[in-house]
């Protein structure tokens, strides 16, 4: 990147999204609202909350060639493959393919007599899958996956979802190259439009990542997999761990209070991965759920070290867990709110780098909302 651009970025990055450091507020929730059981807090124990640690959620595996261990993978949340196929058949569906299961249930591509278009069935225990289904039933936006139907058989809930050709992770892997800036901005705009809508409904997704962005084409993208979503959230709250460590925001990793700004951080990681493929900001993801929980501390240290977070970029609240636990690891060699040095190695387009930098503001109060980001010139002109 030319020095002229670097100087421009430094000036650009010295500004913040808002004059104040108060978290954004969202408008009241319009009816209808998800009818979630009042006894459900949505904040389970840390070790139970990592809802999806798969890579390439839409990677296909032949139904008849699945590993034997997969057959035995039926714990209290995931029905066995045979049971899931029986449930699908009882509703008139013929399973074509099985997809990588999440922790909430089996995922299968299926067709129904008289309906040639394939659909995706997400089949799981009623408690967890039904909560996700009730949430999706009450949302309606082109950038959020649309639930076609909810079917119940005993203790099993089956969600019927549209079938997309790929997820963004698989799309990037197959393309094996960076997505051009104009296409990446079109995709990111749809993601942010979906988040703006969800946040206005007081829903935070909590697991925005390339695996959970479904795509048919550059201009047909949606946010999917609401197994980790939380409702209702406006003010920062103690919501526990959820999602995926390498895309979690600092405040989530620190187990501090957080709100919708956590989704903005994750969407910033998605944009970076589109523009910098195959480079990633934070390498070496853990491989087991236990390692995910244990690695929150090391991941947060990695963020501070990689981005060279200045102490002035920490939240102003001295009682914040992020401040109390991690400000001692901050770095002084980089001035606050200036370009992250690690961006130099990937040579991002200036518009893309500006957006990623804004979305990866370490202090959530300085992170723009989806509404603010969509007002930026690079999106307004699309």
UniProtKB/Swiss-Prot annotation:
Which portions of the sequence form the region Disordered? 1-75
- Nucleotide-binding as a keyword of this entry, yes or no, is yes
Bias (Polar residues) occurs at 12-24
Which intervals carry biased composition (Acidic residues)? Answer: 45-75
Can you give the residue ranges of the Protein kinase domain? Answer: 93-379
GO MF annotation terms = ATP binding; protein serine kinase activity; protein serine/threonine kinase activity
Q: Can you tell me which family this protein belongs to?
A: Belongs to the protein kinase superfamily. Ser/Thr protein kinase family.
What is its biological role? Multifunctional serine/threonine kinase that plays a role in several processes including egress of virus particles from the nucleus, modulation of the actin cytoskeleton and inhibition of apoptosis. Phosphorylates protein 26 and 29, two critical regulators of capsid budding from nucleus to endoplasmic reticulum, thereby facilitating virion egress. Modulates and redistributes host components of the nuclear envelope, including LMNA, emerin/EMD and the nuclear matrix protein MATR3. Phosphorylates envelope glycoprotein B (gB), probably to direct it to the cell surface.
Q: What is this protein called?
A: Serine/threonine-protein kinase US3 homolog
What is the organism field in this record?
Answer: Equine herpesvirus 1 (strain Ab4p)
Q: What is the lineage of its organism?
A: Viruses, Duplodnaviria, Heunggongvirae, Peploviricota, Herviviricetes
